Regions:
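Feature captures the catalytic cores and cofactor-binding loops of soluble hydro-lyases/lyases
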Residues: 22-23, 27-46, 50-119, 127
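An N-cap/entry alpha-helix motif that binds or orients negatively charged groups
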Residues: 1, 5-29
């Protein structure tokens, strides 16, 4: 799914276009905890969050996400938007809830960043 399709599906406003282009979004994940993002985040993913802090932009850049979507009408600080511009990280603002945004993307075929049980790429074997 392309970022323009995400923007349309979420009825989002573009706070930062990331320098232009229309990147491919591989998958999506939703969390209000930066620690979760650092554990399961993947390059090329779309991050949906209501946590409108500078730390989210830093973590998103570290993971190399395709874009960040701030949900529930949350407005990130000017510092966060400025950092996103410097890092060429697209930032979208959606008026919809985290749940609603996730559903809108799911029905359009965008997979989640964490596979469902039984669909994992690798299986962890017990050493016990």
């Amino acid at each position: 799914m392309r970022l323009t399709e995400v923007t349309e599906a979420l009825e989002a406003e573009v706070a930062c276009d990331g320098g232009g282009g229309n990147p491919e979004v591989a998958c999506a994940g939703a969390s209000d905890m930066v620690s979760d993002l650092l554990v399961w985040g993947k390059p090329g993913m779309l991050l949906l969050t209501g946590l409108a802090h500078l730390s989210v932009v830093r973590a998103a850049h570290l993971i190399d996400v395709a874009a960040v979507v701030f949900v529930r009408g949350r407005i990130p600080s000017e510092d966060a938007v400025e950092l996103a511009r410097e890092l060429a990280l697209p930032v979208l603002l959606s008026p919809h809830s985290l749940y609603d945004c996730s559903g809108r993307l799911y029905v359009r075929g965008l997979p989640g960043v964490i596979p469902a049980r039984g669909e994992a790429e690798t299986t962890v074997k017990s050493t016990a």
